[in-house]
A protein has these predicted regions:
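Tandem CBS (Cystathionine beta-synthase) repeat/Bateman regulatory domains
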Residues: 1-144
Length: 144
């Protein structure tokens, strides 16, 4: 699901309009053991691994299968179909998310720097927001 970055005049909503701007991040030193602990939370579906602000991998549960607890996770994840651009057309991306059965996509700027996370609500109706994530974390007594 790789996307060409938008080069035309803006017509409708783009990914940046609805993305979570403050997603949880992991560094390249994050281990499989740590990742498994993070992913034990049923609201965490993917780990965004960055180095100096640049997205280097998106890691999902299935990427960790068979990996040793001390292994770094960034080597196990991938980008490609797990990433969209900030200026990508939201309607196109939303349709592709439905077709591919994806609820989470990392969002990067033109330089590959992480800009946020596009997160479809469990209901499939709309996208998660920073306020919604913060409220859920506060209600569960967990830090964001």
């Amino acid at each position: 699901m790789p996307h060409e970055l938008a080069t035309q005049a803006r017509v409708g909503p783009v990914v940046a309009d609805v993305m979570i701007r403050y997603p949880k991040l992991c560094g390249t030193d994050t281990t499989v053991g740590q990742a498994r602990a993070y992913l034990a939370d049923d609201h965490v579906h993917a780990l965004l691994v960055t180095h100096d602000g640049v997205l280097v991998a998106v890691v999902e549960r299935e990427d960790l299968t068979g990996a040793a607890p001390e292994e770094p996770i960034w080597l196990l994840g991938r980008l490609g179909d797990r990433v969209v651009g900030v200026d990508d057309d939201l309607a196109v991306v939303s349709r592709e998310m439905n077709e591919w059965g994806r609820r989470r996509l990392a969002v990067v700027d033109r330089g590959g720097r992480l800009a946020g996370l596009l997160c479809r609500k469990r209901s499939g109706q709309g996208f998660c927001s920073d306020d919604g994530v913060a409220a859920r974390a506060a209600g569960r007594g967990r830090p964001m």
